[in-house]
Protein backbone atom coordinates (compact mmCIF):
# COMPACT_ATOMS: atom_id res chain seq x y z
CA UNK A 1 0.00 0.00 0.00
CA UNK A 2 1.40 3.39 -0.91
CA UNK A 3 1.40 6.39 1.36
CA UNK A 4 0.18 9.84 0.48
CA UNK A 5 2.62 12.71 0.21
CA UNK A 6 4.36 13.98 3.31
CA UNK A 7 4.36 17.71 4.17
CA UNK A 8 8.09 18.02 3.53
CA UNK A 9 7.51 16.74 -0.03
CA UNK A 10 5.06 19.59 -0.64
CA UNK A 11 6.97 22.51 0.86
CA UNK A 12 7.80 23.97 -2.58
CA UNK A 13 4.13 24.04 -3.60
CA UNK A 14 2.93 27.54 -2.71
CA UNK A 15 0.12 28.28 -5.18
CA UNK A 16 -2.21 25.28 -4.83
CA UNK A 17 -4.82 26.07 -2.19
CA UNK A 18 -3.71 29.70 -1.96
CA UNK A 19 -6.71 32.00 -2.42
CA UNK A 20 -4.57 35.13 -2.83
CA UNK A 21 -2.83 34.30 -6.09
CA UNK A 22 -1.87 37.20 -8.29
CA UNK A 23 -2.72 36.71 -11.95
CA UNK A 24 0.10 38.11 -14.05
CA UNK A 25 -0.84 39.43 -17.49
CA UNK A 26 2.74 39.47 -18.76
CA UNK A 27 4.90 36.43 -19.47
CA UNK A 28 6.03 35.06 -16.08
CA UNK A 29 7.86 31.71 -16.23
CA UNK A 30 9.04 32.02 -12.64
CA UNK A 31 5.53 31.18 -11.41
CA UNK A 32 6.02 27.51 -12.40
CA UNK A 33 6.42 25.03 -9.54
CA UNK A 34 7.33 21.34 -9.38
CA UNK A 35 6.94 18.35 -7.13
CA UNK A 36 8.76 15.02 -7.09
CA UNK A 37 7.68 12.14 -9.30
CA UNK A 38 7.05 9.21 -6.96
CA UNK A 39 7.06 6.71 -9.84
CA UNK A 40 10.43 7.41 -11.44
CA UNK A 41 11.03 3.84 -12.56
CA UNK A 42 7.90 3.80 -14.72
CA UNK A 43 7.18 5.48 -18.04
CA UNK A 44 3.77 7.12 -18.12
CA UNK A 45 2.19 10.14 -19.75
CA UNK A 46 0.80 13.17 -17.97
CA UNK A 47 -1.51 15.21 -20.19
CA UNK A 48 -2.85 18.71 -19.63
CA UNK A 49 -5.75 20.01 -21.72
CA UNK A 50 -5.72 23.80 -21.57
CA UNK A 51 -8.75 25.18 -23.47
CA UNK A 52 -8.44 28.84 -22.47
CA UNK A 53 -5.01 29.91 -23.74
CA UNK A 54 -4.75 33.49 -24.97
CA UNK A 55 -1.85 35.48 -26.37
CA UNK A 56 -1.53 38.53 -28.61
CA UNK A 57 -0.57 38.85 -32.24
CA UNK A 58 2.80 40.66 -32.24
CA UNK A 59 1.80 42.73 -35.29
CA UNK A 60 -1.85 43.67 -34.75
CA UNK A 61 -2.12 43.27 -30.97
CA UNK A 62 -5.33 41.30 -31.47
CA UNK A 63 -5.97 38.34 -29.16
CA UNK A 64 -5.35 34.79 -30.32
CA UNK A 65 -7.21 31.92 -28.64
CA UNK A 66 -6.19 28.28 -28.47
CA UNK A 67 -6.59 24.97 -26.78
CA UNK A 68 -3.16 23.70 -25.80
CA UNK A 69 -2.34 20.06 -25.16
CA UNK A 70 0.77 19.37 -23.11
CA UNK A 71 1.83 15.73 -22.72
CA UNK A 72 5.01 14.56 -21.05
CA UNK A 73 6.76 11.55 -19.60
CA UNK A 74 8.17 12.74 -16.28
CA UNK A 75 11.64 12.07 -14.99
CA UNK A 76 12.31 13.33 -11.45
CA UNK A 77 10.16 16.48 -11.34
CA UNK A 78 6.56 17.15 -12.37
CA UNK A 79 4.86 20.49 -12.98
CA UNK A 80 2.18 21.52 -10.50
CA UNK A 81 -1.09 22.21 -12.33
CA UNK A 82 -2.15 25.48 -10.68
CA UNK A 83 1.26 27.00 -11.35
CA UNK A 84 0.91 25.85 -14.97
CA UNK A 85 -2.49 27.54 -15.16
CA UNK A 86 -1.05 30.82 -13.86
CA UNK A 87 1.94 30.50 -16.20
CA UNK A 88 -0.28 29.99 -19.24
CA UNK A 89 -2.45 32.91 -18.13
CA UNK A 90 0.67 35.09 -18.12
CA UNK A 91 0.74 34.88 -21.93
CA UNK A 92 -2.42 37.03 -22.01
CA UNK A 93 -0.51 40.20 -22.97
CA UNK A 94 2.46 38.43 -24.56
CA UNK A 95 2.87 39.34 -28.22
CA UNK A 96 4.29 36.44 -30.18
CA UNK A 97 3.42 34.15 -33.07
CA UNK A 98 1.61 30.89 -32.35
CA UNK A 99 4.66 28.79 -33.21
CA UNK A 100 6.86 30.83 -30.87
CA UNK A 101 4.42 30.53 -27.96
CA UNK A 102 4.35 26.72 -28.23
CA UNK A 103 8.14 26.48 -28.37
CA UNK A 104 8.54 28.90 -25.45
CA UNK A 105 6.13 26.82 -23.36
CA UNK A 106 7.93 23.60 -24.23
CA UNK A 107 11.38 25.08 -23.53
CA UNK A 108 10.27 26.49 -20.17
CA UNK A 109 8.84 23.11 -19.14
CA UNK A 110 12.02 21.31 -20.24
CA UNK A 111 14.11 23.76 -18.20
CA UNK A 112 11.78 23.30 -15.22
CA UNK A 113 11.32 19.53 -15.16
CA UNK A 114 13.93 17.91 -17.42
CA UNK A 115 11.34 15.35 -18.60
CA UNK A 116 12.14 12.23 -20.57
CA UNK A 117 9.74 13.36 -23.29
CA UNK A 118 7.37 16.30 -23.87
CA UNK A 119 5.08 17.57 -26.60
CA UNK A 120 3.09 20.78 -26.84
CA UNK A 121 0.32 21.18 -29.40
CA UNK A 122 -1.59 24.42 -29.84
CA UNK A 123 -4.88 24.41 -31.72
CA UNK A 124 -5.61 28.06 -32.42
CA UNK A 125 -8.98 29.37 -33.53
CA UNK A 126 -9.05 30.71 -37.08
CA UNK A 127 -8.19 34.30 -37.87
CA UNK A 128 -8.58 35.53 -41.40
CA UNK A 129 -10.03 32.16 -42.35
CA UNK A 130 -6.90 30.18 -41.38
CA UNK A 131 -6.22 28.20 -38.23
CA UNK A 132 -2.66 27.45 -37.13
CA UNK A 133 -1.92 24.35 -35.06
CA UNK A 134 1.79 24.26 -34.13
CA UNK A 135 3.14 21.04 -32.67
CA UNK A 136 6.54 20.75 -31.03
CA UNK A 137 8.18 17.93 -29.12
CA UNK A 138 11.40 16.86 -27.44
CA UNK A 139 12.94 13.57 -26.37
CA UNK A 140 15.98 13.33 -24.13
CA UNK A 141 19.07 13.13 -26.38
CA UNK A 142 20.78 9.76 -26.82
CA UNK A 143 17.84 7.85 -25.36
CA UNK A 144 14.81 5.93 -26.55
CA UNK A 145 12.84 9.15 -25.97
CA UNK A 146 14.80 10.93 -28.70
CA UNK A 147 13.72 8.23 -31.13
CA UNK A 148 10.18 8.43 -29.80
CA UNK A 149 10.11 12.20 -30.41
CA UNK A 150 11.26 11.72 -33.99
CA UNK A 151 8.66 9.01 -34.60
CA UNK A 152 5.81 11.03 -33.07
CA UNK A 153 6.79 14.12 -35.05
CA UNK A 154 6.89 12.20 -38.33
CA UNK A 155 3.50 10.62 -37.61
CA UNK A 156 1.84 13.62 -36.02
CA UNK A 157 -1.55 14.63 -37.34
CA UNK A 158 -1.60 12.09 -40.18
CA UNK A 159 -5.36 12.38 -40.47
CA UNK A 160 -6.12 16.06 -39.84
CA UNK A 161 -9.63 15.73 -41.27
CA UNK A 162 -10.46 13.56 -38.23
CA UNK A 163 -9.47 16.29 -35.78
CA UNK A 164 -12.29 18.47 -34.52
CA UNK A 165 -10.72 21.36 -32.67
CA UNK A 166 -13.02 24.25 -33.47
Curated annotation (Swiss-Prot):
It comes from the Bacteria. This is NADPH-dependent 7-cyano-7-deazaguanine reductase. Substrate binds at residues 79-81, 98-99. The active site is at residues 57, 64. Signal peptide: none annotated. Pathway: tRNA modification; tRNA-queuosine biosynthesis. The lineage of its organism: Bacteria, Bacillati, Bacillota, Bacilli, Bacillales. It comes from Staphylococcus haemolyticus (strain JCSC1435). Catalyzes the NADPH-dependent reduction of 7-cyano-7-deazaguanine (preQ0) to 7-aminomethyl-7-deazaguanine (preQ1). It is found in: Cytoplasm. One of its GO terms (cellular component) is cytoplasm. Keywords: Cytoplasm, NADP, Oxidoreductase, Queuosine biosynthesis. It catalyses: 7-aminomethyl-7-carbaguanine + 2 NADP(+) = 7-cyano-7-deazaguanine + 2 NADPH + 3 H(+). One of its GO terms (molecular function) is preQ1 synthase activity.
